[in-house]
Amino acid sequence: MQNIIIRKKKDLPLVNVAVAVIQSEDGYVLMAERPYGKESSGSWEFPGGKFELGESAEQALAREIYEELGIKPKMAYPWISYKFAYPNKRVKLHVFRIFNWEGTPSGREGQRISWEDSDAIRVSPLLPANNHILEVIKLPLLYILTNTSQSSMVKFMEVLVKLFEQGVRLIQVCTRHMNPEQLTQITRPIVKLA
């Protein structure tokens, strides 16, 4: 009789990973193939790698991007963080957006790299943990949270019009203290404005 060990996802080791979404001026994102000899070699991903002992997410990102691609980010913007479970481990991805860097990206570990349209990634297979990034990258960079209970509706709409004029396209209206009638009263003008 064979012993089968069933592990719960929460019991799997958690690996912290710094990930870079490097975006060119024309909107393309840089994808890198996992090099031969590494786990999941041949799969494509956003560049990055595991934290070393004592490193912050920013330090791990800068080190990994330089080691893998030979570039130094001028600024890396913390963007999203999430966990993903593989059969043998869990990863926590600390994802950064990079729009400016020094150097020319190249596969310094023998890996192929490719500039891809984030709406139509051609390289495959992709590591599954990267799918969430591809969903979120379609959202606008600027996300406004509102608190309507602290202002009048007229003032709120004036501010909202200015934000729309400045290019804001994603707004979350905090409605914790609103009844359905108040919610309808505030959302109708917002929908018309959009």
Place the predicted regions along the sequence by residue:
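Conserved Nudix-box catalytic region and its N-terminal flanking loop in Nudix hydrolases
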Residues: 4, 28-68, 80
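Conserved N-terminal beta-strand and adjoining loop/helix that marks the start
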Residues: 4-30, 81
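Active-site-adjacent beta-strand/loop module that shapes the phosphate/pyrophosphate-binding cleft
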Residues: 24, 82-104, 119
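A short coil-to-beta-strand element that immediately follows conserved catalytic motifs
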Residues: 71-81, 96-97
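Short loop/turn motifs at secondary-structure junctions
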Residues: 72-74, 92, 109, 164-167
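NUDIX/MutT-family hydrolases
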Residues: 95-97, 105-138
